[in-house]
Amino acid sequence: MTNTRKTHPLVKIINHSFIDLPAPSNISTWWNFGSLLGLCLVIQILTGLFLAMHYTSDTLTAFSSVTHICRDVNYGWLIRYMHANGASMFFICLFLHVGRGMYYGSYTYFETWNIGVILLFAVMATAFMGYVLPWGQMSFWGATVITNLLSAIPYIGTTLVEWIWGGFSVDKATLTRFFAFHFVLPFIITALVMVHLLFLHETGSNNPSGLISDSDKIPFHPYYTIKDILGVLLLILILMTLVLFSPDLLGDPDNYTPANPLSTPPHIKPEWYFLFAYAILRSIPNKLGGVLALVLSILILMLFPLLHLSKQRSMMFRPLSQCMFWILVADLFTLTWIGGQPVEYPYIIIGQLASILYFAIILLILPTISLIENKLLKW
């Protein structure tokens, strides 16, 4: 008798991806974040769908429609805060997932890695446009400041910005198109995730040692399905604790004031997960230079496969590289802190030093240390 799970055209795909998938026997909890990101995406799409049923993308009613969702819609407050804090959980998982890839050398699967970087850009774009939708003060001014950066592009800059705005300032046309894009992008992200998995399953998963694990594989189910369920429960626990006890912990109080083009908030800053990039942007006194640094701060991830000069794939047996990696992590925390501070002494200089260090570690220090470690192997 044939097993439907292995022969049915549709079920067969699921079987090869999540049930009979050969997985390394030693992958740690750091490999849980892929499935958690999948869960985050599902949560965001579902809560977003229900929010879209009650939201109106008009400058006159957007703010009130969000208030209406929180006050009058059944469990609307829960859906709204799950969506807002779900974005934070999404980015926490993303940063940990990327960090895991950097530490264990997963970027040597460069198709999977590059699709992942494109996914990171897509999620950041989606989150930015979603933040504009409630049409509070920070929504409006955040949209104005960030879209205005494109005017730094030589020759076509101003025209491009006005084309994105759909007028001469951030207004009704901008809000409507941001809503349209915010709705459609998660589905594009879902398609990209499938491509990401397709490329991953061509090679199989990496593992903490960075060594080929073909001789020691175990089936994904039940071993890693059970392990993933633990991660899922912990993620839901953290998310629901945040949503039910302090839903506004990570938000900005300014966004509870309706958008007013005539009054600028004292400190314009994005959500916490963009602060590191915002700090890099602000650390360069030139507009175009800042924009380039902002884009490069994420785009630099695509260079990782080229900058890998070590004879070992993972950092597991490379103490000098490990040390530098954790300095990079500390540097990113510093940048995140600086991004939320006002532009004044000493924050300006700290931000500039942290930005220089960020690029120096990735482009110069880590590759150099890799070469030193290669030499040490021969001793």
Swiss-Prot record:
**Residues engaged in binding heme b b562:** 83, 182
**A single BP term in Gene Ontology:** mitochondrial electron transport, ubiquinol to cytochrome c
| Subunit structure and binding partners | The cytochrome bc1 complex contains 11 subunits: 3 respiratory subunits (MT-CYB, CYC1 and UQCRFS1), 2 core proteins (UQCRC1 and UQCRC2) and 6 low-molecular weight proteins (UQCRH/QCR6, UQCRB/QCR7, UQCRQ/QCR8, UQCR10/QCR9, UQCR11/QCR10 and a cleavage product of UQCRFS1). This cytochrome bc1 complex then forms a dimer.
Other comment: Heme 1 (or BL or b562) is low-potential and absorbs at about 562 nm, and heme 2 (or BH or b566) is high-potential and absorbs at about 566 nm.
Q: Which cofactor does it need?
A: heme b
In Swiss-Prot or TrEMBL terms, this protein is called Cytochrome b
**What role is this protein assigned?**
Component of the ubiquinol-cytochrome c reductase complex (complex III or cytochrome b-c1 complex) that is part of the mitochondrial respiratory chain. The b-c1 complex mediates electron transfer from ubiquinol to cytochrome c. Contributes to the generation of a proton gradient across the mitochondrial membrane that is then used for ATP synthesis.
Q: Describe cofactor binding as the record notes it.
A: Binds 2 heme b groups non-covalently.
Listed GO MF terms: metal ion binding; ubiquinol-cytochrome-c reductase activity
Question: Binding positions for heme b b566?
Answer: 97, 196
Localization of this protein: Mitochondrion inner membrane
Gene name, Swiss-Prot/TrEMBL? MT-CYB
Task: One Pfam family, please name it.
Answer: Cytochrom_B_C
Please indicate if the UniProt record lists Electron transport as a keyword.
yes
Entry keyword set: Electron transport, Heme, Iron, Membrane, Metal-binding, Mitochondrion, Mitochondrion inner membrane, Respiratory chain, Transmembrane, Transmembrane helix, Transport, Ubiquinone
Report the sequence similarity comment from the record.
Belongs to the cytochrome b family.
What positions does the entry give for a ubiquinone binding?
201
Topology with respect to the bilayer: Multi-pass membrane protein
Q: Record's superkingdom?
A: Eukaryota
> Membrane-crossing residues?
33-53, 77-98, 113-133, 178-198, 226-246, 288-308, 320-340, 347-367
Instruction: Give the GO cellular component terms, alphabetically.
Output: mitochondrial inner membrane; respiratory chain complex III
CDD domains listed in its UniProt record: cytochrome_b_C, Cytochrome_b_N
